[in-house]
């Protein structure tokens, strides 16, 4: 979002994605360092590595176009802990958060010859979440396989609408989903 804001301000895309990555990483590192001072959380090296990857993925996609087949998204759905008031903000409740690695199936399978854009917007996503997290960071890991949508591929000519679609593309929208672990379960729609 930092990079997109810089683009809107007239900064060239390559520089905007670099500066956006730096700004994003600084903010996320601040949050991670703050977690380090909380006994119930602590600093997490794996979280910081994930922060780096997420912050600089747009920059690396500009430098290495083959990476455009992959996208990271997130979604949130209030957990029982959040509903009970254990957290003020949903982003502080890791049990409410889902992280998705999305793949551009049409690009991977070289289906670009399809002339109808509606086929091109469907992607495949692998999702991850954790429930019943304890103070040591242990919990029940959940793995999902889901349909995903690449809204940026919907052909629109209105600039503002394109920007809305680009913003929504950071989030995994409700879709049919198969939960793989801890037990196999199908959801007609999962956030």
Where are the regions that the model predicts?
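Hydrophobic alpha-helical membrane segments
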Residues: 1-191
């Amino acid at each position: 979002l930092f990079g997109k804001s810089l683009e809107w301000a007239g900064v060239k895309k390559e520089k905007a994605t670099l500066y956006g990555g730096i700004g994003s990483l600084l903010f996320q590192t601040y949050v991670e360092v703050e977690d380090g001072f909380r006994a119930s959380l602590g600093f997490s090296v794996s979280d910081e590595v994930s922060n780096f990857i997420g912050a600089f993925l747009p920059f690396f996609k500009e430098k290495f176009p083959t990476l455009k087949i992959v996208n990271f998204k997130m979604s949130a759905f209030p957990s029982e802990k959040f509903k009970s008031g254990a957290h003020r903000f949903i982003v502080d409740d890791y049990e409410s958060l889902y992280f998705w690695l999305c793949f551009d199936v049409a690009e991977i399978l070289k289906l670009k010859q399809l002339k109808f854009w509606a086929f091109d917007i469907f992607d495949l996503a692998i999702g991850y979440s954790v429930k019943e997290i304890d103070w040591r960071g242990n919990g029940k890991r959940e793995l999902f396989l889901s349909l995903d949508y690449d809204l940026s591929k919907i052909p629109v000519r209105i600039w503002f609408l394109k920007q809305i679609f680009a913003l929504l593309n950071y989030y995994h929208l409700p879709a049919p989903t198969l939960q793989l672990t801890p037990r196999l379960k199908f959801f007609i729609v999962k956030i």
